[in-house]
């Protein structure tokens, strides 16, 4: 009897521990926009740090995600296979009582993911980013940002605060570089094969690991430390596209001893760094 009671008590304790355990990693499929908060138990809302969402989210869901980012523990957000749809509540109201809402499907708006994130992977289905000239959608510096898919153009101001790793998915074909001084600052960058040109001030850093094998054109100061400053790239090897035709003066400065592989191409000597 004592053995039976001991086993019963152990079973009850185990079930209680499981019942009240808080999850730090969650994957949620949200098929009904506006219902994301109902898909996550309250106890997990306080503890989740790593959240993956698929399905459909609207303004109400983004408002809830912002709450998890700013007032709870969420720091890793993966929306790669989610779809942002119009509707729902305003996800943010600023100090001037201006409401930020989602009015169009597959669109990222200003301050949408403003919070304490370290990792953000945006939906592949995004086709438009609508932010102010000097603001972006995540506000604060972030370690890792993954962006692109159906998006064709990317403003540099929308990615310049990614500090450690920036991955731009296949499909993005061009950068929009205004305003000056907002180039990419990430130390490790993956460019898609669909980007063929680096325009003026694409990168705002002096140390970067980036694949440039598919780049056919390097613009003036496309990699420089900061606007009028010139930085020395702290890399050992550069391998260029076989289709490289123009290498502009002051595209970037290399440290002494850097090895350059031109893949048997013969660049037109418009100008050399």
Indicate residue ranges for each PLM-predicted region.
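Accessory end-domains appended to solenoid repeat scaffolds used in host defense
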Residues: 5, 47, 58-67
């Amino acid at each position: 009897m004592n053995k039976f009671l001991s086993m019963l008590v152990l079973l009850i304790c185990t079930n209680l521990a499981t019942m009240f355990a808080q999850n730090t990693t969650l994957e949620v499929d949200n098929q009904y926009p506006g219902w994301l908060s109902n898909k996550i138990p309250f106890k997990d809302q306080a503890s989740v740090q790593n959240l993956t969402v698929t399905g459909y989210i609207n303004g109400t869901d983004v408002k809830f995600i912002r709450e998890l980012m700013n007032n709870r523990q969420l720091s890793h957000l993966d929306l790669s296979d989610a779809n942002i749809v119009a509707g729902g509540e305003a996800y943010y109201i600023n100090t001037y009582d201006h409401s930020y809402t989602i009015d169009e499907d597959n669109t990222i708006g200003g301050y949408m993911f403003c919070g304490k994130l370290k990792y953000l992977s945006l939906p592949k289905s995004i086709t438009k980013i609508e932010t102010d000239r000097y603001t972006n959608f995540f506000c604060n510096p972030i370690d890792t940002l993954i962006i692109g898919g159906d998006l064709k153009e990317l403003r540099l101001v929308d990615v310049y605060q990614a500090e450690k790793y920036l991955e731009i998915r296949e499909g993005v074909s061009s950068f929009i570089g205004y305003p000056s001084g907002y180039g990419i600052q990430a130390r490790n960058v993956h460019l898609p094969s669909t980007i063929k040109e680096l325009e003026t001030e694409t990168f705002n850093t002096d140390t970067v690991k980036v694949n440039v094998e598919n780049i056919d054109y390097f613009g003036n100061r496309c990699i420089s430390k900061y606007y009028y400053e010139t930085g020395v790239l702290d890399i050992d090897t550069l391998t260029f596209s076989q289709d490289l035709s123009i290498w502009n003066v002051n595209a970037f400065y290399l440290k002494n001893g850097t090895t350059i592989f031109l893949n048997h191409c013969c660049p037109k000597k418009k100008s050399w760094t």
